[in-house]
Amino acid sequence: MTTSQSLFEKAQRVIPGGVNSPVRAFKGVGGTPVFIDSAKGAYITDSEGKRYIDYVGSWGPMVLGHNHPAIIDAVLKAVPNGLSFGAPTAIEIELAELVCKLVPSIEMVRMVSSGTEATMSAIRLARGYTKRDKIIKFEGCYHGHSDSLLVKAGSGALTLGQPSSPGVPEDFAKHTLTCEYNNLASVKQAFEQYPNDIACLIIEPVAGNMNCIPPKEGFLQGLRELCTQYGAVFIIDEVMTGFRVALGGAQSYYGVTPDLTTLGKIIGGGMPVGAFGGKKEIMEFIAPTGPVYQAGTLSGNPIAMSAGLACLTELSKAGNEQLLAEKTKTLAEGFKALADKHGIPMTVQYVGGMFGLFFTEQTKIESYQDVMKCDVKAFNTFFHKMLEKGVYLAPSAFEAGFMSLAHSDEDIAYTLEMADLALAEMK
């Protein structure tokens, strides 16, 4: 029995499923999850001392690489001053100012402790601001585990939402409309059906929770126009894409301006931080300046703010945005070339510092329906072969991969060398 197997058995006795977030259990790919002891740069080291080149990056935050000196130094300097005050600090102003500078659509920002809190709060704010109840989300997009958003499409092309998890009341889920990602007509139909009832529309600008699906040309702009036309708040969920697709987020990359933006992952530099922000007129509707209530004991935690400020300061240095994109392109196109070499059907999609591998004959993946046609078993086989060879990919066919600035040319070359061997073994 390996150390990870032993730890997993022990964990399952006191933690549901042995993990504190479901995807970590490896249920999507099978086998025992790898328990990690430490990480540095592009590498993670498991409980038995084996090192892996890491393309999960703590599910996105580690854009600079693990254990980055600038972030560690900032945290070590902040810790002696106290871990939490429950009071305003100067450091939270600095981080807020930098966020507003990097993301021009954000005129004011409120810090929270997770991406789920950010999306949940943004939706509550939109409902309070518009005095409407219904929201639009997209099939296959994930915005955290709040009740409004754990909703899937019903049986029709456009139906009232059905809960996708026990514990979410149908009466609550009925306020959530689920449309098809990259299908503007389905969104237009929703607005036409409920012209005065929709408070907001929320979307992942690049769908990273059904692997990596960029928006069709004009799709985000079309959503912006519909929200403006019907008086709905347009929310872009940049928890995953923020500062990774581009410094200004996917919204700057694709040239679209939301009313509200949600952030997470990178904004904390590895610490638990989320944020939501946008137009001053809307943001001032939140307490204490407005009637919509939102609060958090650890919101603006000084240690987390210090880590986030250090991360964004380092990331925003000249050349880093382009370098991250170039590294991702090299890896992604390398995967595709190797799959073609071995005659294994694969489509690879990437944008900025994120990428997705789809085992499929389809040449373009644009929707949840397309993703469902992909060969999950082939991905699972590839995942385990790469894991054996020291490369750690996301343990799910439906999750994006993440590049970091710490991945060297040699790391990427080794990854592709191992992929060459893995794909050869799959023929």
UniProtKB/Swiss-Prot annotation:
Reaction equation(s) it catalyzes: (S)-4-amino-5-oxopentanoate = 5-aminolevulinate
Q: State which pathway it belongs to.
A: Porphyrin-containing compound metabolism; protoporphyrin-IX biosynthesis; 5-aminolevulinate from L-glutamyl-tRNA(Glu): step 2/2
Residues where N6-(pyridoxal phosphate)lysine is found: 265
PROSITE patterns named in the record: AA_TRANSFER_CLASS_3
- Superkingdom field: Bacteria
Q: What is its main location?
A: cytoplasm
Protein EC: 5.4.3.8
According to the UniProt entry, its GO molecular function terms are: glutamate-1-semialdehyde 2,1-aminomutase activity; pyridoxal phosphate binding; transaminase activity
UniProt-listed NCBIfam families? hemL, PRK00062.1
Q: How does it assemble?
A: Homodimer.
* Record's protein name: Glutamate-1-semialdehyde 2,1-aminomutase
Q: Look up and give the organism this protein is from.
A: Glaesserella parasuis serovar 5 (strain SH0165)
Q: Which gene encodes it?
A: hemL
